[in-house]
Amino acid sequence: MLDGLVLRFARDRAANVAIIFALMMIPTIYLLGMALDYTQALRKQEQLDAAADAAAVASVRPAMLTQTDDTVIQNTAAAVFAAKANLPGLTTVPVPTVTVVDTGLQRTITVSYTAQSINNFPSVLGSPAWPIRGSSTARASSAPNMNFYLLMDDSPSMAIGATQTDIDNLITYTASKYQSASSSQNCGFACHETNIAHDGGTQDNLAIARSRSITLRIDLVTSAVNQLLNAWSNCPQSGVSGGVMQCMSALNNTTYQAALYTFDLGLNTLASLTTPKAAGAKVSNIALMPVAYHNCVNTTNNCKTDNGTDIAGALTSINSSMPTPGLGSNTVGDTPQEVIFLVTDGVEDKIAASCPNATFAGNSRCQQPLDTTICTTIKNRGIKIAVLYTEYLQLKTPNVTVTDGWYMSWVDPYNEPTSSTGTIAKNLQSCASPGFFSDVQTGGDISTALTNLFIKVASSTASLVQ
């Protein structure tokens, strides 16, 4: 009887399908449960990864890069992570592990976690939760604390008219009708001569320029330094007073100091290293170097020529007063980075025993593109040099073939084929640290150029690496 029932059941095709279906339901239910729980765990992991990303990035923001206490950094990262990691479907809120590694100015933050995603089919999978884990790494180089040494050329060549219109007006108003000193007539330079009577004049070209509201290149340099230290209206951070330097200090959470110098025959100290605000109070003291009269540099009997630009000498003097730079971090015992900002037309004009980049113009007068030997010495100490080249161009005089014959003989050869590619420009580029060179031609915006160059030196970036 039983044998017959079994045989009949085995022969029944409908029964076979039922059995096969029943047998297949077991792995199907298992796979379906596993897929649902695995998908849920992946979603939880993505959310926790985002929380780890946020925590890592928050720990390398500029405000946090000034923090030197690892515990504070770790607690900050943990708090940001916890705010985003309190998710339903986890056995507990995970507590992240935060590691902080500082290497010089670079900080690396790693936020890692482990968690358990609750399974909806624990009996099917044989486990109440699915383990998940992840990590995120953020790495940023903090902007360094810096000392800036602003070195401005105030030699007679900086008395050139600021624009072509200024040059034309200066030439017009230094004609014999207005200027009785023959050596200063028809000149695009507003030289400051304290004894113009020696040459038969009653007022020097600087006085004429001021009375005619003619803007000079030295005026643009002064305005650019004023924007750097005293007044800038474009700071993206509200509540910051002062110039570009104070704005960048606030944005980067750094400490900047500034020193202010001019140079001609030698180095002139306007403000020793101090706060940007204190240095800014001395900007009004930037002025052209005075000469006694044409072909004389002082009021003694030792007049040699109207030379007055010793760039290498000024760099040598400033180098002797600068300390060895540090990394610029906030680590105890570290010191700021040191940066020289040189603003010049790049042509030396001095009495010297040797003239390596040119031939003597006479009376040991060396008029040459900058000898970059001192630049190499400075950079080898780890000091950075930023250079703003205010290009030395030939003066174009209306209806006069050549009024600047001296320039054509002793300067123009070093400006060929163009002022941007000649030896003067090349030597200044060589003097500057990589990427820290900018140039401005007559009529160019010196304030914008100096501001952009400063921002380039002071800027840093942060990036996320996962």
Task: Identify the function of each model-found stretch.
Residues L2-I26:
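Glycine-centered recognition micro-motifs in short, flexible terminal segments and loops
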Residues I19-L36, A50:
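Alpha-helical hydrophobic helix detector
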